[in-house]
From Swiss-Prot:
Keywords (A to Z) from UniProt: ATP-binding, Cell inner membrane, Cell membrane, Membrane, Nucleotide-binding, Translocase, Transport
Family in the record: Belongs to the ABC transporter superfamily. Thiamine importer (TC 3.A.1.19.1) family.
PROSITE patterns, A to Z: ABC_TRANSPORTER_1, ABC_TRANSPORTER_2, THIQ
A Pfam family recorded for this sequence: ABC_tran
Provenance organism: Salmonella typhimurium (strain LT2 / SGSC1412 / ATCC 700720)
Swiss-Prot/TrEMBL induction comment: Expression is repressed by thiamine.
Protein name: Thiamine import ATP-binding protein ThiQ
Length: 235
């Protein structure tokens, strides 16, 4: 589904270079120290950064130079990027039509995702009238209503309390399984990664330093465990 072949981003004197393959429906966590290049990797996939070289394939098609708005990708950030002057209904509708002129089918999709997110009763409220968790549900609904096959999460739930964060992670995981979406999620928490992603990638110094089973990473047995401050449980 998603393949990066020597995708290179020139960051000062440190070229970041990524080679990666992710299958359709796979849920993958991206971990690593601060400044390692995790968000850069997502931004290259989303098209917000243009690589100096390399190839990016999605579903077999070359999207290396495709503008972000035309890529089969949706991305959710820690900052939800909701428009404060638009209500929930309108913010979700932007995912379908930037002009907010929706036909009957699009309105049905908008209302269906709002119901699935549990925010159908909030449709006329402005973002400033919502809690942090509710705002992230709206932002996630706007991503999902676009029905793109790849979903990118850049620590969107890190500011939420642990119980709400776990609830949102479970919701995302369930929807991805239901729709067979390919998910890549940047996180600073290996525990969060373990809840949603059987496979993890560790990024260090602009490279993929390790990839494998999240459980192995969490146990401290992986070669990259020490990069994340995880010690082996074996005495």
């Amino acid at each position: 589904m998603l393949k990066l072949i020597d995708i290179t981003w020139l960051y000062h004197h440190l070229p970041m270079r990524f080679t990666l393959a992710v299958e359709r429906g796979e849920q993958v966590a991206i971990l690593g120290p601060s400044g390692a290049g995790k968000s850069t990797l997502l931004n290259l996939i989303a098209g917000f950064l243009a690589p100096a070289s390399g190839t990016l394939l999605i579903a077999g098609d070359d999207h290396t130079l495709t503008p972000p708005s035309r890529r089969p990708v949706s991305m959710l950030f820690q900052e939800n990027n909701l428009f404060s002057h638009l209500n929930v209904q309108q913010n979700i509708g932007l995912g379908l039509n930037p002009g907010l002129t929706l036909n009957a089918s699009q309105r049905e999709k908008r209302d269906a995702i709002a119901h699935q997110m549990g925010i159908e009763s909030l449709m006329t409220r402005l973002p400033g009238e919502l809690s942090g968790g509710q705002r992230q549900r709206v932002a996630l609904a706007r991503c999902l209503v676009r029905e793109q096959p790849v979903l990118l999460l850049d620590e969107p739930f890190s500011a939420l309390d642990p119980a709400l964060r776990q609830e949102m992670l479970t919701l995302v995981s369930d929807i991805c399984r239901e729709r067979q979406l390919t998910l890549l999620m940047v996180s600073h928490s290996v525990e969060d990664a373990a809840r949603i992603a059987p496979r993890s990638i560790v990024v260090a110094d602009g490279r993929i330093a390790w990839q494998g089973k999240t459980d192995e990473l969490l146990s401290g047995q992986a070669s990259a465990s020490a990069l994340l401050g995880i010690k082996s449980h074996i005495l």
